[in-house]
From Swiss-Prot:
It comes from the Bacteria. Component of the tagatose-1,6-bisphosphate aldolase KbaYZ that is required for full activity and stability of the Y subunit. Could have a chaperone-like function for the proper and stable folding of KbaY. When expressed alone, KbaZ does not show any aldolase activity. It holds the Pfam family GatZ_KbaZ-like. One of its GO terms (biological process) is carbohydrate metabolic process. It comes from Salmonella arizonae (strain ATCC BAA-731 / CDC346-86 / RSK2980). SUPFAM superfamilies: Aldolase. This is D-tagatose-1,6-bisphosphate aldolase subunit KbaZ. Belongs to the GatZ/KbaZ family. KbaZ subfamily. Pathway: Carbohydrate metabolism; D-tagatose 6-phosphate degradation; D-glyceraldehyde 3-phosphate and glycerone phosphate from D-tagatose 6-phosphate: step 2/2. Coiled coil: none annotated. InterPro entries: Aldolase_TIM (IPR013785), GatZ/KbaZ-like (IPR012062), GatZ_KbaZ_carbometab (IPR050303), TagBP_ald_KbaZ (IPR023435). Forms a complex with KbaY. HAMAP family: Tagatose_aldol_KbaZ. One of its GO terms (cellular component) is plasma membrane.
């Protein structure tokens, strides 16, 4: 995968560059990302997680082939060349089937890998760190690595079978907190030690050799570690470079390896840039993008309520809250406290569990009505200034059309701009 290997090669030669991975399946988030990459002439890495997308449909209802088609059709409609698009699979392994015995869970993981690779995903994160129903807790490095090597062999065979060659790029390892933000309130976070990182690498190298996969080791281009960044519902742990100094030095001894940092959402622009400089050259972002989407929609709903009588309004926020209460499975094990605390978390939490509800038909109908209501007449500038002040500046400067969709996309792109600046050292254009 030339874009990723070129990035790693340049980084290892001393360039403080990187790439960000957009981890979302929301159409407006993906449109924002594709348009931003197109305007700035950069490749775009879009990743699906094993929770979102799997051979059975995941929580999005999409298989890997469905997700590929969805993203590629969107890219085509926006004039973005598919040659600049990189698809990645995140946390691929037995994650979805931890409640099953390891034999069954890994059989499902084999099929998961086949479905991702056959669909043309080229960046494959092998994560077998989770214990299955009959496993010890925690798993040893050796077991984790053996299972990852097994999946790598499946991936290589599938790629050869479907494409006549294998150009897959692999990521191994995992961060300590769960994917997508911590479940509980954060108190302290341990940075991965150099010793633990080396142990993960060596265990995987040995397991790959046992599977006869020595030749693909140079294509293991990233190791997931915990650099000391995380967020929960109301707090952010900011990157502290001094705590990751030894870890950062350790990766310099490997020829074609950088770190991949998960849960970088809500870090400051300065922290994102420093992460890249410290060799955390792949930055994952997801909830921060849907958080920005939610912010923009809540702002537009407030504008709608100022402009229209209640009976004509979309009632987006009311519909959203009602559906979340009727179907609490995506938030009830994450948000705690009294009724008011949970209500606030449902709407405003950094962990953004609301992102699981946007595809709901009732909520989508309310969203479409909101957009229609505000598209009929120009939105008064003072209301844009009140509720979307950053977009107001762009509207006033003639850089942004004040339509509902463009205001939403611009707000999401404000987050993407921070990641672009961190990875490319420059700030270019929203589009």
């Amino acid at each position: 995968m030339k874009h990723l290997t070129n990035m790693v090669e340049q980084h290892k030669r001393g360039k403080a560059n990187g790439i960000y991975a957009v981890c979302s399946a929301h159409p407006l988030v993906l449109e924002s990302a594709i348009r931003y990459a197109h305007a700035n002439h950069t490749p775009l890495l879009i990743e699906a997680t094993s929770n979102q997308v799997d051979q059975f449909g995941g929580y999005t209802g999409m298989t890997p082939a469905d997700f590929r088609d969805f993203v590629c059709q969107l890219a085509d409609s926006l004039g973005f060349p598919q040659s600049e698009l990189i698809l990645g699979g995140d946390h691929l392994g037995p994650n979805r089937w931890q409640n099953l015995p390891a034999t069954q869970a890994m059989a499902n993981a084999d099929d998961l890998i086949k479905s991702y690779v056959a669909a043309g995903f080229k960046k494959i994160h092998l994560d077998c760190s989770m214990s299955c129903a009959d496993d010890p807790v925690p798993l040893t490095d050796e077991i984790v690595a053996e299972r990852a090597a097994r999946l790598a062999k499946v991936a290589e065979e599938t790629c050869q079978q479907h494409f006549g060659k294998s150009d897959l790029v692999y990521v191994i390892g995992t961060e300590v907190p769960v994917p997508g933000g911590a479940h509980e309130t954060l108190t302290e976070l341990e940075v991965t030690t150099p010793e633990a990182a080396r142990a993960t690498l060596e265990a995987h190298r040995y397991a790959f050799e046992k599977q006869g996969l020595d030749a693909i080791w140079p294509r293991i281009n990233a190791l997931v570690v915990q650099p000391g960044v995380e967020f929960d519902h109301t707090q952010i742990i900011d990157y502290q470079p001094q705590k990751a100094t030894e870890l950062s030095k350790m990766v310099e001894t490997y020829d074609m390896l950088v770190f991949e940092a998960h849960s970088t959402d809500y870090q400051t622009p300065q922290s994102l840039r420093q992460l890249v400089k410290d060799h955390f050259a792949i930055l994952k972002v997801g909830p921060a993008l849907t958080f920005a989407l939610r912010e923009a929609l809540f702002s537009l709903a407030a504008i709608e309520e100022e402009l229209l009588p209640a009976k004509a309004c979309s009632g987006l926020r009311h519909v959203l809250e009602s559906v979340m209460l009727d179907r609490p499975e995506y938030w009830q094990n994450h948000y705690h406290g009294d009724g008011n605390a949970r209500r606030l978390a449902r709407g405003y939490s950094y962990s953004d569990r609301v992102r699981y509800y946007w595809p709901d038909s009732q909520i989508d109908d309310a969203f479409e009505r909101l957009v229609r209501n505000l598209a009929d007449e120009p939105i008064p500038l003072p209301l844009i200034s009140q509720y979307l002040p950053l977009q107001y500046v762009k509207v006033r400067e003639g850089d942004l059309n004040a339509t509902p969709r463009e205001l939403i996309i611009s707000h999401i792109q404000d987050i993407l701009q921070q990641y672009h600046a961190a990875c490319y050292g420059t700030t270019f254009y929203n589009e």
